[in-house]
Amino acid sequence: MILPINTYSDPVLTAKAKPLKGVDSSIRELIADMFDSMYKAPGIGLAAPQVGHSLRLLVVDISTIKEYADYKPMVVINPRIVSVAGRNAMEEGCLSVPGVAGDVVRPSKITLHYRDEKFEEHTEEFSDMMARVLQHEIDHLDGTLFVDRMEKRDRRKVQKTLDAIKQGRVKTSYPIAPHAPKIAVEA
């Protein structure tokens, strides 16, 4: 099932997601729905908070990028970055921040401890694009969006688009969750 994507300023995107204690049929269904939703958008990574579930769960598939065609889709549960190395800047975008792109500096290599869809533990090293996508998605689990990591001058350039998203004035080729703008209350 295709799930609607929550967009910029939705509270679920700024909350710290809760760890999973295991994988049952409802989590397996959510994982399948997340892959379907990611491919429909199309995207290369999707975190559970982006589809309204405050859980430490994400899916990644960078094989649609020509130079990464050999990579397999990946399910990551309860990730924890245990070490980082190098740094580089690269343009990022996000399904939850449609129409916005900007450079973000991140470590170019990470060692990640996580559980897979069978809840089996792994510790692996990732570099380049895969390291970047994983860090971007893990940020979602920690309540951080890529625009929060952009240089201030770059963020100012996209502020009008961010304001439009915040007000629910955004069009996408994929379904987005209903957006209820905050209403000012007079004291």
UniProtKB/Swiss-Prot annotation:
First and last residue of the signal peptide: none
InterPro entries listed in its UniProt record: Peptide_deformylase (IPR023635), Peptide_deformylase_sf (IPR036821)
Active site: 137
GO molecular function: metal ion binding; peptide deformylase activity
Highest rank taxon of the organism: Bacteria
Function recorded in the entry: Removes the formyl group from the N-terminal Met of newly synthesized proteins. Requires at least a dipeptide for an efficient rate of reaction. N-terminal L-methionine is a prerequisite for activity but the enzyme has broad specificity at other positions.
NCBIfam families: pept_deformyl (TIGR00079), PRK00150.1-3 (NF001159)
Protein name in the entry: Peptide deformylase
Organism: Chlorobaculum parvum (strain DSM 263 / NCIMB 8327)
